[in-house]
């Protein structure tokens, strides 16, 4: 069968297969000229209808000569259709019905005008009216002025993001109770500064131009000047007036009623009552509600103290106070370790990023500054509490970032984060270490940061440090400091923290030292007079009244409801005979004598470090450098000198290592507990690690040599219940802050630190959220040595901290400043020198406790249980009960959480 041949080209509308016309048809010029020259004729002129006019061919007309013709379209004649009513009377036989129905009936027909004469005026009014867009059924339902330019955005009335009337809703801000919120907009301040700079620069340019023009002989007229009137005398409106005000201008902004702010329900379900209270406090501080109440109270107190004071002076002082504290929307979260400061700050940050009293978010960006070891921990916490893919942070740990791939440098990532605005902000939270931020702070210039969280904020204790200066230069009015120990050494450090979070709150540094620091310290001294004590207490009360509005402090006692019991012990250890002999030789050496006499060139810190190392183990010393005559030392014959190749550690020459060896053996053989061993010296960790290898104990170690990326993996491996490692060696300097080691329920701190905050941070690693077992914590202190002097100094600092932060005014004045200078004296005839300084009335002369304290206060060891060597047998800890058979422990303080 032959196949049908398809056409070589498709049909083009002219005909199937017909070639289209290639040459256009010529224009008939003559026809166009005739049409244009022809006189105009009114198409609807009133004329009489002729007898044959207007007739339309009917069906009968289509029959000619007995045959039917092809039907044609009806022929219509328009002449005579527009007639008067009088002329419309004619014989119905002459005009068919179809002619009557084809009469003109539009708006201009004479027939309709004859029926309604008022129609003409309506037509004229319609033609003269201004043109409008012919939209059928359009009704203007708004009162906005119709101006040139883009269509204005209609701002809807704000509404709360979450239902405040829900049964489990946690309302942070209620406008009916808290009043209107004064939001400090830093972006407007920057715009004002930029506009001032632009105005100043333009004025300078104008002055330069005027000087140039004055020097010329013929002054030229300024070109491009905006004339006040147009040529017709009408005022020449500027373009801004023609286009209307900007929708972001202050005059054009609509003032809506504030709406409640509610915590996200997914966070409200997991927050504990004390954490809800903390989030409320943080929100009121960073939104200015607390500052507003404080300024109102200050103004009221100023007027009520001296009614006769002139109004101008009172107004000046009030304005000065308000100016100093304008925009200082910060606070200090000083909860003790383990109370969930991280979760509370995440709830605050998430609320500010999502909600506000006007229905939109209050902040666009947030910076979290923390130690380098906690950068990844913060990122994990965000995912843990908010859920995956909810909020993507930019975590910068100093070497690489999570932005822009592997080729992006840290500086480029921070710069890109700072430049992002509006919808380009895909990672609103920057998590960065203190060191990295200090090096790259220039990248954050002109960047408006809504909130700054300074974790472990006691790093800002020095107001003159580079870290403090770098963070203070960032444009951020809302600053929150997280620190479990705000007072570490003195009130000056406390002032530095408050001046960072709330600049101007306590005046200048000199004013703070004069008004608060000096009177309080004089009153706290054991040798203070009654007048100094009274003045110190008055200033302490005044300081506490001010700072209590901007600092929140809760103790670990709250955790008793949620965590297992904690048993904390301060173990006073007797030195071994070899340690005692070497210690006496060191304190009698020429180096130590120079330190005691204050001779120039002496090194007190070096001498203190040598004595502290000896208290741990003699192998930590270098005998050649640290003893005057090494040959006079009477060392045992079997003693292995430092640097020997012996595989074992001679624990019998160190009391601390002897106790540690017995502790580890009991834990390994009688329980499934895990233990954390912490020291300030990596050399001590080396000896412990050597002992663990010899005993075949599986252990992991975290110190300053480990990279930041590997630390969190190591912590996760140790916390795994199925893991084989039961010993975690930790350097207090490298990982004492923020690391959660809840896989272990026992902890030993081998040596004390001068700073009580460092020890408190280290001791809080195991008793935290997620802990399932009872915790046992031990602090080793060598009896009668420099370590006990350090512990006494810590007690004085903790006493100072409790007075200012915890508002405990009844802490006993324990030590004189002169007693703390006697560091290099060893007390041979004591079981616990610290206990003797307490003058404890609950114990007899042998140190046996006769009655317990009414209540135990964690920061006050005078209220703890006091255990002499015989009392160890009755403790509920099987490790300490076993030590009753040995003479290494002379005394112990015991704290029980609940």
Swiss-Prot record:
Q: Where does ATP bind?
A: 335-342
Gene induction: Expression increases in late G1 phase compared to other phases of the cell cycle.
What GO cellular-component annotations does this UniProt entry give?
cytoplasm; nucleus
GO BP annotation list = chromatin remodeling; DNA geometric change; double-strand break repair via synthesis-dependent strand annealing; heteroduplex formation; reciprocal meiotic recombination; telomere maintenance via recombination
Q: Which InterPro entries match?
A: Helicase_ATP-bd, Helicase_C-like, P-loop_NTPase, Rad54_N, SNF2-like_sf, SNF2/RAD54-like_C, SNF2_N, SNF2_RAD54_helicase_repair
By its UniProt entry, which Pfam families does this protein fall under?
A: Helicase_C (PF00271), Rad54_N (PF08658), SNF2-rel_dom (PF00176)
List keywords of the entry alphabetically. ATP-binding, DNA damage, DNA repair, DNA-binding, Helicase, Hydrolase, Metal-binding, Nucleotide-binding, Nucleus, Phosphoprotein, Zinc
What are the Helicase ATP-binding domain coordinates in residue numbering?
322-504
Which residue numbers delimit the Helicase C-terminal domain? 659-812
Q: What family is this?
A: Belongs to the SNF2/RAD54 helicase family.
Q: Can you name this protein?
A: DNA repair and recombination protein RAD54
The organism of origin for this protein: Saccharomyces cerevisiae (strain ATCC 204508 / S288c)
């Amino acid at each position: 069968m032959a196949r049908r041949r398809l056409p070589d080209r498709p049909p083009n509308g002219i005909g199937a297969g017909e070639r289209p016309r290639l040459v256009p048809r010529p224009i008939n010029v003559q026809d166009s000229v005739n049409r244009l020259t022809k006189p105009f004729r009114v198409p609807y002129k009133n004329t009489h209808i002729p007898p044959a006019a207007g007739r339309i061919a009917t069906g009968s007309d289509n029959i000619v000569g007995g045959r039917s013709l092809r039907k044609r379209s009806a022929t219509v004649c328009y002449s005579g259709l527009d007639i008067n009513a009088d002329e419309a009377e004619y014989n119905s036989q002459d005009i068919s019905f179809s002619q009557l129905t084809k009469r003109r009936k539009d708006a201009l027909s004479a027939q309709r005008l004859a029926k309604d004469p008022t129609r003409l005026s309506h037509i004229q009014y319609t033609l003269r009216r201004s043109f409008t867009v012919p939209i059928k059924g359009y009704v203007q339902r708004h009162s906005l002025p119709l101006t040139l330019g883009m269509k204005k955005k209609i701002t809807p009335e704000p509404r709360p993001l979450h239902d405040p009337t829900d049964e489990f809703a946690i309302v942070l801000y209620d406008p009916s109770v808290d009043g209107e919120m004064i939001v400090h907009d830093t972006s407007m301040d920057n715009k004002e500064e930029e506009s001032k700079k632009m105005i100043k620069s333009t004025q300078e340019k104008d002055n330069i131009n005027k000087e140039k023009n004055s020097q010329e002989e013929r002054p030229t007229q300024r070109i491009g000047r905006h004339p006040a009137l147009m040529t017709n005398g009408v005022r020449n409106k500027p373009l801004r007036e023609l286009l209307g005000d900007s929708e972001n201008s202050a005059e054009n902004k609509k003032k809506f009623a504030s709406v409640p702010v509610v915590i996200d329900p997914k966070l409200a379900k997991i927050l504990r009552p004390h954490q809800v209270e903390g989030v409320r406090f943080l929100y009121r501080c960073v939104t200015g509600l607390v500052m507003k109440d404080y300024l109102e109270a200050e103004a009221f107190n100023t007027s009520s103290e001296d009614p006769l004071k002139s109004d101008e002076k009172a107004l000046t002082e009030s304005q000065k106070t308000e100016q100093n504290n304008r925009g200082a929307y910060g606070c200090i979260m000083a909860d003790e370790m383990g109370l969930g400061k991280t979760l509370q700050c995440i709830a605050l940050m998430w609320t500010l990023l999502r909600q506000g009293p006007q229905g939109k978010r209050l902040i666009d960006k947030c910076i979290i500054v923390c130690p380098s070891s906690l950068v990844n921990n913060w990122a994990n916490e965000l995912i843990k509490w908010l859920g995956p893919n909810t909020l993507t942070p930019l975590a910068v740990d100093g070497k690489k970032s999570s932005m822009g791939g592997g080729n992006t440098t840290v500086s480029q990532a921070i710069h890109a984060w700072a430049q992002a605005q509006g919808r380009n902000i895909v990672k609103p939270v920057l998590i960065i270490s203190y060191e990295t931020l200090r090096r790259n702070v220039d990248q954050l210039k002109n960047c408006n940061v809504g909130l700054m969280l300074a974790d472990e904020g006691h790093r800002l204790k020095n107001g003159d440090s580079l870290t403090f200066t770098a963070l203070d230069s960032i444009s951020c009015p809302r600053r929150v400091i997280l620190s479990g120990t705000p007072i570490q050494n003195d009130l000056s450090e406390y002032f530095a923290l408050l001046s960072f979070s709330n600049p101007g709150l306590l005046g200048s540094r000199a004013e703070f030292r004069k008004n608060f620091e000096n009177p309080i310290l004089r009153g706290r001294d054991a040798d203070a007079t009654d007048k100094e004590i009274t003045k110190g207490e008055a200033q302490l009360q005044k300081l506490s009244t001010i700072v209590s509005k901007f600092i929140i402090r809760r103790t670990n006692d709250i955790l008793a409801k949620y965590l297992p019991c904690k048993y904390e012990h301060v173990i006073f250890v007797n030195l071994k005979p070899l340690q005692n002999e070497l210690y006496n030789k060191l304190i009698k050496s020429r180096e130590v004598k120079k330190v005691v006499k204050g001779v120039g060139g002496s090194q007190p810190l070096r001498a203190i470090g040598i004595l502290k190392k000896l208290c741990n183990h003699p192998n930590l010393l270098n005998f050649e450098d640290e003893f005057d005559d090494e040959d006079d030392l009477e060392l045992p014959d079997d003693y292995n000198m430092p640097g020997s190749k012996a595989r074992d550690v001679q624990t019998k020459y160190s009391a601390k290592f002897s106790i540690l060896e017995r502790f580890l053996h009991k834990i390994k053989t009688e329980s499934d507990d895990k233990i954390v061993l912490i020291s300030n010296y990596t050399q001590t960790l080396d000896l412990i690690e050597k002992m663990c290898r010899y005993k075949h104990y599986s252990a992991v170690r975290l110190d300053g040599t480990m990279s930041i990326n590997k630390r969190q993996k190591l912590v996760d491996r140790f916390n795994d219940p199925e893991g084989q490692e039961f010993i975690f060696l930790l350097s207090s300097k490298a990982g004492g802050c923020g690391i959660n080691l809840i896989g272990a329920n026992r902890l030993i701190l081998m040596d004390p630190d001068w700073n009580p905050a460092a020890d408190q941070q280290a001791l809080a690693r195991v008793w935290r959220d997620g802990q399932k077992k009872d915790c046992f914590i031990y602090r080793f202190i060598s009896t009668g040595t420099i370590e006990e002097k350090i512990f006494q100094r810590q007690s004085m600092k903790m006493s100072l901290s409790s007075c200012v932060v915890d508002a405990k005014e009844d802490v006993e004045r324990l030590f004189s400043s002169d007693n703390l200078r006697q560091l290099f004296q060893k007390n041979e005839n004591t079981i616990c020198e610290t206990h003797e300084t307490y003058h404890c009335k609950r114990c007899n002369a042998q140190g046996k406790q006769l009655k317990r304290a009414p209540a135990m206060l964690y920061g006050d060891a005078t209220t703890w249980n006091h255990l002499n060597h015989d009392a160890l047998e009755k403790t509920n800890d099987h490790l300490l009960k076993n030590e009753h058979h040995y003479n290494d422990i002379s005394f112990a303080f015991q704290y029980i959480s609940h």
